[in-house]
Amino acid sequence: MCAAVCLLLNCGSKPTSASKQAEKDGIPVWVYGGRKDNTGLYAVGAGKLSNDITSRKMAVAQARLELAQSVEVSVKGITQTLVDDQGAEGDRQFLAALSENAALTTEAILNGSEQADMFKAGDGTIYVLMYLPKSTFVTELTKKASTFNRTSSAAYTEEKMAEAYEKYFSTNK
């Protein structure tokens, strides 16, 4: 999963085997390789059910699940880094609880996702490219951190979490 986040967050300009395969098959490159830029996260979902409407719903659900997993992995990574950096046991407990609490806000974060593209393959499979702006999840995670029940010693930690979310998601491409 961590590799998937790295793949989503890293930009590359070399043609990949996925893009070569996509060109060969006559389908959009993003179906195989997703899309990458520094404004947000992208995820691809696929569905092939009895009709296009339910196939699209399935594809959107799969892509949103992938977005949720990417955000969760990123939040856990940021939080673990801060937990490792903090010395006080109380702050460590706060960060662990905040990380768990932030995972619960995934639905609010995903409400900011949008369909960026869709493709219907010759075999009837519907592919959907979903996009989640970084500003959406940084805002939601910061909101969650600021409303979290905290002690005075944890206020500093809360501030560091907000800074870490902003820094991580605005600098990783």
Question: Where are the regions a protein language model picked out?
Answer:
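Domain-level marker for long, solvent-exposed, non-transmembrane regions
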Residues: 11-173
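Sec-dependent bacterial lipoprotein signal peptides
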Residues: 1-14
